[in-house]
Amino acid sequence: MKKLFSIIIALAVTFTVKAQWVNNPATNTFLANTSTDAGEIYIATCPNGDTYLQWSSFVGGNGWAPTLQRINSLGEPQWDNDGVHPSYHQMASWSQGFAMAATSDGAVVTCFATEAGHTVATKINPDGSYAWGEQGITLFDGYGESRTELLAGDDGGVWALGTSVDLGNIYVCYIEANGTLNPTITISDDSGKLCMFGLMVPAPNNNVFVVYEKEQWAYTYFYEKDIRVVGYSKDGTQISDDVQLMSPLTISGSYTHYVVPDGLGGAYVYIWHPAGQGGSFNTYVFHFNQNGASTILDLNGIPVHLTDPANFYLDAYATVDPVSHDLIIAYRQTDEQFQSESRVYVNRFNETGERLWNEGIVVVEENGQTHSDILIDAFEYGDGYTVFYTEGDGYYSTVKAMGINDNGTQIWNTTMSSNSYPRTMCRNTCGYLEGQNIMAWVNVSSGGLYGQNIGLNGEMGEITPPTPPTPCYPPTNFEGEAYYNPETQISAAILSWTAPDPLPLHYNLYCEETKEIIEIDAEYTSYYIEREPGDYIFKLTAWYEDCESDFAHSPNGENYLIIEIPSHESVAEIEYDEIVNIVEIYNINGQLTNTSNINDLNQGVYIIKGVTESGKMVVRKIIR
């Protein structure tokens, strides 16, 4: 049985998205003036429904530089048609890789390396003014002359990442909402390898995981590289081991990895390259959990297809199902010999690397056209996803979208832009919010940034937000400890938790070692389970009418419990620390009694939750 996500209630919505957005694929919606060479288009939607767009081009005489525009949920530009262009710094004549992130306080941050070799971050308020001045903030003590990345925090600040190709270092720091800098973190290698292509995903408690590549030159343009992950807190403390996700491979330096958060504090990682098993090119999937530990044992990764040397499987883009937390990955297939075929596939993976749709599902068949710019987004409440792609002759193209349900079956097909012309598409998606997603592109023939909205049913223009599903709250304070009765020589684990409100239909207790799933009545908030000495992992969910919750968390933030039941020869340690303050008493069935005084109890077996002499909260079984 798959674990399901606890759905967060969205605010009630009483309006319908309409106004400027059009329902005509032949016209679309004008968003900003751009030159014909504009590119590197990024898009991000704020919690309030406004969307920021960033593109790069030669403008204002200061080199290849970013420009930004803000639109509301109706598709109406909120700034001048030329957008906002930070022009304080002189930029190089090429792109080192710019970044953009919408912040939780409704602003936007852009980050870039200047021609002088410094990394700069600039924050722009919703009204177009500069929160930190147009000059922005110089990061990393002046280091970092190459590509940048940004990740929004939960308090209006951002994580920023910079790269020094010259030194082979990655630099990371957290910028507070007011522009205050936290300590710079340097990721480097003592043996002389380069640390490159850092990407960031959120870790619990507003921390960050950095997924990066360690590489050293092999020959010509080939490098031996592996993929690693390491976690940090805002004050620069390393919070997880530096873990290898992918074994070293010798591949072209241009093949780099991508990441997508799994919604549980970890992330999926994927990369396509020609050096592994299967086709001449294949896409490989990895995963790490909220502790930064790899959950896929094969360090070669799991391929989207098994053995198929006659075909390439590449150009992937992925999303995560918000309910099951599975990875949904879309990718292009073409024949190895002539590369004349073009199909779009999707496949599904869980966190252990199980390929749930076997060899994938074809969602766009070969039709003599080239399919490119593949993107994918899950519906905001699950139940399906949208695959976006362009279709054309490789230069002129149209924009299409296809709705797919959880079984991989097409449910709708929409042409978003029907006029065929050369275009540069956005590099990412903004995700569904209130039932709406947005695609954007630059018209390479005449210039101009254009966009189109689309709903969960493939509709454009007027979109009615969906009704949020009933929330699935998990239990909390999942605790437990070992128990041993020397008279009967019976050992057990005693578990307890705090019930969610409202109560579920029942709880599911997952016993990892025995692969059992035990159903527990909703009236109980503790459970006694006999086990032989050994180490046991338990997980707990709440089961509702329409969904199953996320796993319950322990007081220290883990979504599982490890109970060590010692051998019978050493069990005296279990009872040594006596309970001095009884908090709650349950009967053997897990029902809470109305007393915390043992003397008030009738004869029988009870479970006591209390505080010991050392201040530890424990759960123990007694016979009255």
PLM feature spans:
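Extracellular, repeat-based ectodomains that mediate carbohydrate processing or recognition
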Residues: 20-466
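Short beta-strand segments within Ig-like beta-sandwich modules, predominantly Fibronectin type-III
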Residues: 517-523
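Beta-strand-rich modules
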Residues: 529-548
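Pro/Thr/Ser/Gly-rich low-complexity, intrinsically disordered linker/stalk tracts
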Residues: 466-502, 547-566
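Short glycine/proline-centered coil/turn motifs in the loop regions
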Residues: 60, 115, 393, 489, ...
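Short strand-edge motifs at loop-to-beta-strand transitions and within beta-strands
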Residues: 525-527
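C-terminal outer-membrane/trafficking sorting elements
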Residues: 18, 506-516, 532-537, 564-624
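Bacterial Sec-dependent N-terminal signal peptides
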Residues: 1-21
